[in-house]
Structures are given as structure tokens and as C-alpha cells.
Design a protein with these regions (language model features):
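Primarily recognizes Gram-negative and organellar outer-membrane beta-barrels
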Residues: 1-2, 14-380
Length: 380
């Protein structure tokens, strides 16, 4: 086990630089304060995380200053769960066993920058761009079973296939379930803000123009298998009843928004100002989930595959037909959401040595539109 931190810094009268890093495998996410696991709380299993960061700051103490930061985070997770339970209320399947194994990993980059320019006493210009890049992977294997009696009275390995067959011969088995999944996520987010402020001579009179914008591009994939066998239900063919679901999902999601704002402040008395502001914002989100259903394939088709990160081809190579032939329109989903917001504010501000008063009114007309295609139904 290890937990290491490091920091280095450089300063002069105009420029500051600080670099820091953290690496550990004791479930510490690298944030100060609170218990291990940071403000996100304790995490299960074995977790290793790494973090590198760089902060920069420049100020010429006259008209120009800027600061920026870049941060990289990496994490690996390994969590195994074993559960044995007894239900004192159920009349059937009152004993249960479950084991699951989950592996996760993620990489993320976060960059932020702020520039402020004051060419003279009347102007102030600010620019703030941001960028975030994230990739994450996961794979999970779960096995569970339900019994009519305590399986540990008969075996030490109640989830072993041979032992399940023996327990079934004794009439103790109710059902078994095996499921696997692999997931992948990729996200890119860009944002920016530009603000221009101009003083208009008289003390306290000024006008501010501001533009904000964000763009978010996400893509996720998942492949999941589920096999359930009911030992006490008879199928149409006279054997044990079974259920299976084999599905592959791809979900690209895009969203963007922008806002325009103008604010005017007028002094009407000593340390008393009347402020008028107008803001317009537009946002758009689009999600297009495509689901491919392979549940008609024979049971256990994918049973010999061990899930690994992004191992889509291990599953898709076993298909008998092109992937497009398995597209399920009912399980797929397409949606769009648009939002238009206007905001008008009129505010009175009073500043005194011992107290401050802000009072105002706001009107916010809003219009939204939503469209969806899901389960064969179009909603608009």
C-alpha cells in the first residue's frame, strides 16, 4: 500500500507557478478534509488514483493579469462483493447467494484559464475559457442463485455449476442468474465567457455586456448479457424455464447553449443605484440511443467470453448476421430538447457603512420544446 503527495512552487513579483501531484492506492481521491475517499465518501474495493496539477498566475500590477490551471486525474477500481442471505418472510427462494466482480478505470483532463485586461480606468475586459476531457471504462460479472434451503448444509460452493446441478437434483434450486457488462464513456466539454465593462463617467454609472457558451459531446457504449434459469417453472417444451437478454447500446449525446446579457447601472442618489439587466439564453440537447438486441440467439452464446475493457469485437464477432439486422427500433430512443429563456431584472441597490439593501423585480418568460421517438411512439 502507498500514499504519496508532492508539491513545488516558484514565485516572483509578477509570476507564480505551482505544481502538485498525488498517487495512492488507499482509496484517497486526493482531496483534503474528511475521511478517506474525499468529499465523495468512502469507496468500496481496491482503488488506486493519480493526480497531477499545474497552476499559473501572472499580474503586471498595471493593466493585465491572467491565471490558468491544468489537472489530470486517473483512477483504477477493483471491487468484489460476496453476499449470502436468508429471507425470513419469503416462502420460496428464502436463501440466496451472490458474487460480483467489477473493474473500473477513468482518465480526465480539466483546463481553465482567465484573462483580465484593463487598458484604462474606464474599460475592463475578461475572458474565461474551459475544457474538460473524460474517458471511463468498466466491466462487471455477476452470478447469483436462490434456494429453498440453506445450500451450505450441502456444499461449500453453492454457486459452482456442478454443485448447482446436485442441489437441483435434491429439489433445492429456485433460480440462477448470470450477467456480464462492459461499458465505455467518452466526453468532451468546452466552455467560454467574454465580458466587457465600460464606465460612463459619473461615479457608479456603467454598462456590462457578457456572452457565455458551452458545448458538450458525449458518447457511451455498453454490452450486457443476462441469463436466468427458473428451476421450478416449466417451459413450453417441458424443461426448466429460461430468460435471456443480450443487448448492445450506443448513445451519442450532444448539447450546447449560449447566453447574451446586457446590464446598465445608474446612480440615483448617494451610494444608491438602479440596475437594469436583460438576458437571453438558448440551450439544446440531443440524444440518440441505438439498441441492438441479440436475445433470439441461443442461450449461452456469449458465455465463453471474459469481459474486458472495450472488447466489443469479442461479442460482435459471434453474430451470424450483420449488426444492423439486430437493430431494435422499439428499444432505441431518440430525443431532442430545446429551451428558450429571457430574463429581465430591475433592481435597487443601497450601500451603507453598516448595512446593504437589494430589492428588485424579475420577469422570466420561457419556452421549451421536446421531441421523442421511443417504443414506437413519436412525441412532439
Amino acid at each position: 500500500r502507498y500514499a504519496e503527495r508532492g508539491m513545488a512552487a516558484y514565485f516572483n513579483d509578477k509570476f507564480r507557478l505551482m505544481a502538485f501531484g498525488n498517487a495512492n492506492n488507499v482509496n484517497d481521491m486526493g482531496f483534503g478534509g474528511g475521511p478517506r475517499g474525499g468529499f465523495g465518501g468512502l469507496r468500496q474495493g481496491l482503488n488506486a488514483s493519480k493526480m497531477l496539477g499545474l497552476n499559473l498566475n501572472y499580474n503586471n500590477n498595471k493593466t493585465f493579469q491572467w491565471d490558468g490551471s491544468v489537472r489530470w486525474n486517473h483512477s483504477d477500481g477493483d471491487a468484489q462483493t460476496k453476499v449470502s442471505s436468508e429471507n425470513f418472510v419469503a416462502t420460496q427462494g428464502s436463501y440466496g447467494n451472490k458474487i460480483s466482480q467489477t473493474y473500473t478505470r477513468s482518465n480526465s483532463w480539466d483546463g481553465r484559464f482567465r484573462m483580465e485586461w484593463t487598458p484604462d480606468s474606464m474599460w475592463n475586459i475578461m475572458f474565461r475559457p474551459t475544457i474538460q476531457l473524460t474517458k471511463s471504462d468498466g466491466n462487471t460479472v455477476k452470478t447469483s442463485a436462490a434456494y429453498n434451503d440453506d445450500p451450505y448444509e450441502y456444499t461449500d460452493e453453492p454457486l459452482d455449476e456442478e454443485e448447482i446441478s446436485k442441489l437441483n437434483e435434491k429439489g433445492l434450486m429456485v433460480n440462477t442468474q448470470k450477467s456480464t457488462s462492459i461499458t465505455y464513456g467518452d466526453a468532451t466539454k468546452l466552455g467560454g465567457m467574454v465580458q466587457v465593462n465600460r464606465k460612463l463617467g459619473k461615479k457608479g454609472r456603467n454598462i456590462t455586456l457578457r456572452v457565455d457558451g458551452d458545448y458538450d459531446d458525449k458518447n457511451s457504449k455498453s454490452f450486457s448479457t443476462q441469463d436466468i434459469q427458473y428451476f421450478q417453472l416449466v417451459s413450453a417444451l417441458g424443461g426448466d424455464s429460461t430468460y435471456r437478454a443480450y443487448r448492445f447500446n450506443t448513445t451519442p449525446t450532444k448539447s450546447w447553449d449560449y447566453s447574451l446579457q446586457a446590464t446598465y447601472s445608474e446612480p440615483i442618489a448617494d451610494r444608491t443605484y438602479l440596475q437594469l439587466s436583460y438576458k437571453y439564453k438558448y440551450s439544446f440537447t440531443k440524444s440518440d440511443r441505438s439498441t441492438y438486441d441479440f436475445s433470439e440467439m441461443p442461450a449461452g452464446t456469449f458465455g465463453g467470453i471474459t469481459p474486458e475493457y472495450r472488447s466489443w469485437n469479442s461479442y460482435l464477432s459471434l453474430l451470424q448476421n450483420p449488426l444492423e439486422d439486430y437493430f431494435d427500433n422499439d428499444l432505441s430512443r431518440y430525443s431532442e430538447y430545446k429551451n428558450y429563456i429571457q430574463e429581465i431584472q430591475l433592481m435597487l441597490r443601497m450601500n451603507r457603512t453598516k448595512w446593504r439593501l437589494n430589492v428588485g423585480v424579475m420577469a422570466q418568460p420561457q419556452h421549451s420544446s421536446y421531441m421523442q421517438d421511443y417504443l414506437g411512439v413519436h412525441v412532439d
